[in-house]
UniProtKB/Swiss-Prot annotation:
Lineage, broadest ranks: Bacteria, Pseudomonadati, Pseudomonadota, Betaproteobacteria, Nitrosomonadales
Keyword Nucleotide-binding: yes
CDD domains per the UniProt record, alphabetical: EF-G, EFG_III, EFG_mtEFG1_IV, EFG_mtEFG_C, EFG_mtEFG_II
Entry's localization field: Cytoplasm
Keywords attached to this entry: Cytoplasm, Elongation factor, GTP-binding, Nucleotide-binding, Protein biosynthesis
Function: Catalyzes the GTP-dependent ribosomal translocation step during translation elongation. During this step, the ribosome changes from the pre-translocational (PRE) to the post-translocational (POST) state as the newly formed A-site-bound peptidyl-tRNA and P-site-bound deacylated tRNA move to the P and E sites, respectively. Catalyzes the coordinated movement of the two tRNA molecules, the mRNA and conformational changes in the ribosome.
The protein's name in its UniProt record: Elongation factor G
GO cellular component, one term: cytoplasm
Binding site for GTP: 17-24, 88-92, 142-145
Highest taxon of the lineage: Bacteria
Amino acid sequence: MARKTPIERYRNIGVMAHIDAGKTTTTERILFYTGVSHKLGEVHDGAATMDWMEQEQERGITITSAATTCFWKGMDHNYPDHRINIIDTPGHVDFTIEVERSLRVLDGACTVFCAVGGVQPQTETVWRQANKYKVPRLAFVNKMDRAGANFMRVYEQIQSRLKAHPVPIQLPIGAEDKFEGVVDLIKMKAIHWDDASQGMRFEERDIPANMVEDAKSWREKMVESAAEANEELMNKYLEEGDLSPADIKQGLRIRTLANEIVPMLCGSAFKNKGVQAMLDAVLDYLPSPADIEAIDGEKESGEHAERHASDEEPFAGLAFKIATDPYVGQLIFFRVYSGVVTSGDTVYNPIKGRKERIGRLLQMHANQREEIKEVRAGDIAAAVGLKEAVTGDTLCDPADVITLERMVFPEPVIHVAVEPKTKLDQEKMGIALNRLAQEDPSFRVRTDEESGQTIISGMGELHLEIIVDRMKREFGVEANVGAPQVAYREAIRKSVDVEGKFIKQSGGRGQYGHVWIKMEQNEAGKGFEFIDAIKGGTVPREYIPAVQKGLEETLPNGVLAGFPVVDVKVTLFDGSYHDVDSNENAFKMAASIAFKDGMRKANPVLLEPMMSVEVETPADFMGNVVGDLSSRRGMIQGMDDLPGLKVVRAEVPLAEMFGYATSLRSATQGRATYTMEFKHYAEAPKNVAEAIISKK
């Protein structure tokens, strides 16, 4: 089957935003204008097409990134048909893992900003993640019709807070309830969308007289930005003093793809204004798979390899999401980076070392599906029938194996114990939790060896609430949830050299393991590092992996209160062995003995997770909020002003934040909101550490 849409006309994009910037409504409008959904879904009444899990509809927040395919020919039908795959990303801070994993497989993004709230905490997090994956993006300033809307303030915040270079290609005509449309700075025309057709039709008019000067000066800035793309455009601009619309678009495209600028547009998705022009900007400025650098990976031999976005290359894809569908079972969403895959093909998963057969291939529109026969380079689809694959796994041609770069997922910071309400549901709960952990790599399940309880861990209270909620809805298991527990860690603060001996030689086959190790503090976040510095074979080569294993098996249980040990560098530098009695187990035990002894001597400390907290509160309650955060051992990092609101930024230990939502509501009559995300681990003060250790 030949390719229907040339790869240059593909756009794989995400819509990213802070929780209330209007991301879901914006995505809904995209689906409406591209002709996929005929009734506009509104988040306000819980009917949005993309939010297809029930809880999302209740809470009005987007949780799972669904991938949807749609087509666009331009607002004026003046482009050839383009195929846009939209990966819906959540805007709630407990779900940053979902955002991270969708960013991994998209080529460009539309960041939605609220014209009133501007750059909010979650926007900064998502922006940092997009920088990490070098994703080119557009900025869409939404909610221009709301009281307090201010396009220029958002422009300044993108510069000051996100350290980005926004280039407005539109200006709003009016604001708040007077918002009528936009000035297109490339055409120098005013665009008004027609309310009766829900924005399907529009007309171009002259720019309002009171805006002409402003529009000229912003156009000048935009043309200068475009001219800086290359010498040819710069020379044209210097000679002629202007650039043609095609040249402006070319220059802005080059610079957007290089992540030098962010084209900036505006509108009100809810009022059906502006999203249509944003779709045109997706075609004009965001990359096709062919514009993206080849993806890196490695061959089985460990050599570096890469794949280009071409049908001619061997098949390689990345599984980025697992979802359970009530009708077809487990779906694996994957992005094809190179080659072609057909339903019925056998693919190889190098991470699991297994071949698997792809049953059916589906393309999704939110949660409706269309069966397809094949999927080609640059496209996104869902496969049925893959039993082994999980998020982050590579799928490739068995005849040409490549492993694409793995995704790195953060460690959970909060634990709770769960037990089924009825003993009969114990097994059912185990199945449900394992299925949910497969779908979400930032959620973990384990059984506590001492108490026998089931412990679930995640990125925040909301994250775990939703897991418990899904268990009830999707698997019919009701659970009781214990009080949340903080994921403390242990570390060392001084370097020590220690000896570990495991010797049993009383007749018969004995045991003999003997090591000297140096333990020192590693850089924060570096984790455990093992260095083999044995000279002259004092510990034979074949026992060195056993030493490392002995150390790694001791890490989960520190000496202070049994918490995992992090950020420690261990160098094996000496030891001895016995020709007959030495074996792997003896060296493993010797390493473990040395490590425990070293921990006690190396000034062990307790680390606690610190959270970055932002509170938006009416100015009258500012004192209460700051006082409350300080009483929770919070360090105030700074304050900002928003219209009628104060924003307090603080760093607070997670242990002090439980139940914060309730106390914030009562301290501010329910008028303040907050967001919280994990920042880093920090040493717990002595009195706090002693209290935790004494409880163990």
